[in-house]
Amino acid sequence: YKTNEVYLRAAIESILSQTFTDFEFLILDDCPDESREKIIASYSDERIKYTKNSCNLGISASRNKLIDMAQGEYLAVFDHDDISLPERFAKEVAYLDANPQCGVVSCAFKKLIENTVNVNPENNEQITRKMFISCALLHPAAMIRKSVLDNLNLRYEEKFSPAEDYALWCRMIDKTEFHNLPEVLFYYRDHAQNTTHNQLQKMQDRTCFIQAFARINNAALWKGIEQQIRYVTYIKVFGIPMFKIVSCGQYSKCYLFDRITIYYSKTKVII
């Protein structure tokens, strides 16, 4: 959808260069454009199956259409402007094969624009804990066991867009296990035109709703985790950050100008 030709070619070629070769490459164009169709047609690889929507369906509906089309055991998610390193599929497939209890595996990744490496928590317990606070799996780098989605009747939901991936993960918290490979196998193109940047406020609003949903639906698990989370709040007076409140479980501290402790409590904060 509205993809830069250079980015699209780099994305396609990164998939065709995978060392693991037994896959079908499903490409769906949500807003068909003749120039993009010509780009895709220029790759004479029988694994490519190109389809296009007759009208714009949006991210969630398009992803669900691809899930229903897919014939494979695993679904390797991928966006139109990112890059999968050659060993990504091989290593994610190997992990899922060796760990049948795991429904989703992702990996460490590098942000191309910032030139920074991001490593999320690795094991299921750590990922689940973080999922209540923020998304702990990079979606376009993830590989999903299709049977988990089918058996639980799970799909992406448009009402959570553009955070539909985070919502899907949160609905899977008590249904399967997650894992992040520590190796960088993916390059994420975090540029001004991608969905996260274009819909930032909507993303933040949906994220808050998803977190509340996850905490309510996993109340017992969240209760144990909440006691260990450290919250930091700054209070400004006439635009100056004067007070800093640090809370963790039953304990709270209030600092003046981030240095002087002016209040400590095991139960609450009073200013």
Predicted regions and their residues:
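Short aromatic/hydrophobic "clamp" motif used to bind/position activated sugar donors
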Residues: L75
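Acidic donor-binding segment of Leloir-type glycosyltransferases
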Residues: I12-C55
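The conserved acidic donor/metal-binding loop of glycosyltransferases
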Residues: D79-I83, A108
